[in-house]
């Protein structure tokens, strides 16, 4: 009891500052009364509203009386066998109906309510450019009411385990047991250079390629240690002149220099539309592969909508 008495003055003091006033006001209103108000408004009568809500007409009338105490208006005027709303009630209806619709949308577990819900799919900028056009088309075909948001990846495992994002699409490897994944596609690695690079005219000149200046992509995940080791064995003497975690930067740099870089094939296909890039044949490197997967919290599968979205994305690839 003492703690409640201490809280009351705090709420009173803060209510004058803005937002806390909302909670003070809502605490004094039974939100069920707003549902009854909407039922009477929509069905234009107390008896009809009582049937819809499975209540007695007397209970509906008592609720309207409570609303008349809260609001300085009679709200509904008897007209024939029903009631007609006052101008003030019409004004209230605009806001109450929108509020109830928003609540229904937020509580829409089964996806039966035709309002927008936001699904977050985190990616890096480069992976997003590669996969999100395909994902957007697929999701909009099956779930046109969904709104998609694409936040950045900061701490992938934490984002998923703490439900800060719904899905992550990347080539990362998670050790958290709550995070599950499905491989969407597997990509081959390619060696790229700019159009007109002198190396394009040389046939299988391993030594020249090995001695050329290289740009190195630095993936953070530990699961690439094996790939890095094998690439190092293929190019033991390569000269690393530039390193970056950003594959877009690497593509732009290669397109404007004589340096070489190793990137996944699908990124080459995408970037070659933006920059003058070419592939250098290197069969042993082209056999190297990298997986791109969709990652999610395993408890998200309890959500029918999110479960369906995951299936749609998997089928899109």
Swiss-Prot record:
GO terms for biological process: regulation of DNA-templated transcription. Coiled coil: none annotated. It holds the Pfam family HTH_1. Residues 46-65 bind DNA. Keywords: DNA-binding, Transcription, Transcription regulation. GO terms for molecular function: DNA binding; DNA-binding transcription factor activity. The keyword Aminoacyl-tRNA synthetase does not apply. InterPro entries: LysR-type_TF, LysR_subst-bd, Tscrpt_reg_HTH_LysR, WH-like_DNA-bd_sf, WH_DNA-bd_sf. Residues 29-86 form the HTH lysR-type domain. Belongs to the LysR transcriptional regulatory family. PANTHER family: HTH-TYPE TRANSCRIPTIONAL REGULATOR LEUO-RELATED, LYSR FAMILY TRANSCRIPTIONAL REGULATOR. This is Uncharacterized HTH-type transcriptional regulator YbeF. It comes from Escherichia coli (strain K12).
């Amino acid at each position: 009891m003492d703690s409640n008495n201490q809280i009351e003055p705090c709420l009173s003091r803060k209510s004058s500052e803005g937002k806390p006033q909302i909670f003070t006001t809502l605490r004094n209103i039974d939100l069920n009364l707003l549902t009854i108000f909407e039922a009477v408004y929509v069905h234009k009568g107390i008896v009809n509203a009582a049937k819809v809500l499975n209540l007695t007409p007397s209970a509906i009338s008592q609720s309207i009386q409570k609303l008349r105490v809260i609001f300085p208006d009679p709200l509904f005027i008897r007209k024939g066998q029903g009631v007609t709303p006052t101008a003030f009630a019409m004004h209230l209806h605009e806001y109450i109906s929108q509020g109830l619709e928003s609540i229904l949308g937020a509580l829409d577990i089964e996806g039966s309510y035709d309002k927008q819900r936001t699904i977050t799919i985190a990616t890096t900028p480069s992976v997003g450019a590669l996969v999100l056009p395909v994902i957007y088309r697929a999701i909009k075909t099956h779930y046109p009411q969904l709104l998609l948001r694409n936040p950045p990846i900061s701490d992938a495992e934490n984002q998923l385990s703490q439900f800060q994002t719904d899905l992550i699409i990347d080539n990362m490897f998670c050790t958290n047991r709550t995070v599950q994944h499905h491989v969407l596609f597997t990509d081959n690695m390619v060696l790229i250079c700019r159009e007109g690079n002198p190396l394009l005219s040389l046939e299988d000149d391993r030594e020249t390629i090995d001695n050329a200046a290289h740009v190195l992509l630095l993936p953070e995940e530990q699961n690439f240690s094996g790939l890095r080791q094998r690439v190092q064995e293929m190019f033991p003497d390569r000269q690393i002149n530039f390193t970056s975690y950003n594959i877009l930067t690497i593509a732009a740099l290669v397109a404007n220099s004589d340096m070489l870089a190793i990137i996944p094939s699908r990124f080459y296909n995408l970037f070659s539309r933006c920059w003058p890039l070419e592939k250098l044949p290197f069969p042993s490197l082209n056999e190297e592969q990298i997986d791109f997967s969709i990652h999610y919290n395993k408890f998200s599968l309890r959500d029918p909508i999110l479960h369906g979205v995951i299936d749609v994305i998997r089928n899109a690839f």
